Amino acid sequence: MDNPQKFSNSKEVINFLSESFPACFSVTGDAKPLKIGIFQDLAQRLEEEERVSKTLLRSSLRHYTNSWRYLHSVKEGAFRVDLDGQQAAPIEKEHADHAQAQLEESKAKVAEKRKAQNAAKPGAKKSYKSKTVPAFKSSPKGTNQDNVKPKAKLPPPEKLSAEQLVAGTSVTVKIGKSPMPATITDVSKDGVQVQLDTGMVVKVQVDNLRLARSKR
């Protein structure tokens, strides 16, 4: 006959204990505080059980009693139970205080570990902050739709009247595709001589000139 396979971890042992002693151990719901000396009772009851060693049984019991669920159950005045669920001695204040201190310390360690893990992953927060709304494009600094609209409503530049066609008048002259600011320096029959803001002097026809807008 083959030997039964031994348990390999505390989880398997705790599941086994909850099935074998359901009035004492559990894996869900509220835990029950265990009788002092429960390990000796377990060692006697499981003496013929080949699947669990005493070493693994001891570590599994320590794992069970250090769980938050179990520590919550250790309150002053509550009764401990034996393997059959029978009441044993009540929990003393000293033991209850110790359990609460263990619980708070354990929770603090978990919170600190979680905080360290979050701090080690700044990429997640950074990528979240750097997301842009795909439906809209940001406007250049200092401009927005309200600033752009008035420019589209401006009337076209005026042609020069005979009175304005004199030296000293500020104009714009169309050279290439873009109008350039200039000042009339001389008017003759064959054209108008203007000086660009760049300092260049050119002669153009009157039709290429427009009255410069007054600066506000």
From Swiss-Prot:
It comes from the Bacteria. Keywords: Chaperone, Cytoplasm, RNA-binding. It is found in: Cytoplasm. GO terms for molecular function: RNA strand annealing activity; RNA strand-exchange activity. InterPro entries: ProQ (IPR023529), ProQ/FinO (IPR016103), ProQ/FinO_sf (IPR036442), ProQ_C (IPR035236). GO terms for cellular component: cytosol. Residues 105-115 have a biased composition (Basic and acidic residues). Signal peptide: none annotated. Residues 105-159 are annotated as: Disordered. One of its GO terms (biological process) is post-transcriptional regulation of gene expression. HAMAP family: ProQ. Belongs to the ProQ family. RNA chaperone with significant RNA binding, RNA strand exchange and RNA duplexing activities. PANTHER family: RNA CHAPERONE PROQ. This is RNA chaperone ProQ. It comes from Pseudoalteromonas atlantica (strain T6c / ATCC BAA-1087). The gene is proQ.
